[in-house]
Amino acid sequence: STADCLRKLRLAFALVPMLSLMCDNAPVFEGKPREHQLVRTDIWQHVDNDRCGLVPDVLDPSFDLRRYAEYILDTVAILIPCQQQRWCYSDRTFGDIYAARTMTRAEVEHAVSMFFTDVRLKTYIEIRPADAMPIPYVIAYAALIKGLFYAPTSLDAMDGLFADVRRDDYLAAQDALMESGYEAEVFGRPVAELCDRIVKIARDGLADEEQGFLEPLADLVARRVTLADLAERSERA
């Protein structure tokens, strides 16, 4: 349903700062040791701000799909299908290009694909903050997402946890985590406590036989370290 979609989209965005920390695996940037934590977050903060990062107003309780559509339509297309070549550059917005007719499904899918926000809405919700990680951690990330989003009790718990999170909180959280990692405060509380709570919610949302898949990430959280930290120390996870 629309309500379910918007609920999960908002919760996914609220989770992004913590997921970025839990999955941080970039100890090196451009051939040099990193200068701070969450290098991936920093990189995306310096890409096209019109189509990356946080969807405008998505953390506002009044946000709806019309506003999401307006966000897409009011942004420059960059690439559009054309007859002369497969793709042509355009500095017009999607809304201007398609003002005279209804977009086809393929055109809508292309328009949505030209956005690279931290969470992206397609025919599914794409939760994007994780770094590339070794396979056991990728599996753990999948288990984490399943435990958080596929159990009604998990969604209820996250509703309570993130009810008051807004845009400024989100941006402040990213800055705090880049500077201080697990020592940071996020959304008014120690991020380490938030990560513990997130892991517990996810574990409770998984079947008994699935909970073991979560352990690689759960272990990092319990130790207050990231894969990037361990790489800097030349330690094995």
Task: Annotate the PLM regions.
Residues 202-237:
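C-terminal amphipathic alpha-helical interaction region
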Residues 29-42, 68, 162-168, 215-225:
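A glycine-rich phosphate-binding loop feature that marks nucleotide/adenosyl-phosphate handling sites
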Residues 122-124:
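Active-site lining segments that contact anionic ligands and/or coordinate catalytic metals
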Residues 110, 126-128:
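Beta-strand-rich recognition/accessory modules
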Residues 39-51, 172-180, 225-236:
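Short, charged low-complexity intrinsically disordered segments located at boundaries
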Residues 1-120:
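Loop-rich catalytic cores of soluble enzymes, especially ATP-dependent carboxylate-amine ligases
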Residues 128-214:
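Substrate-recognition/cap regions that form aromatic- and gly/pro-loop-enriched pockets
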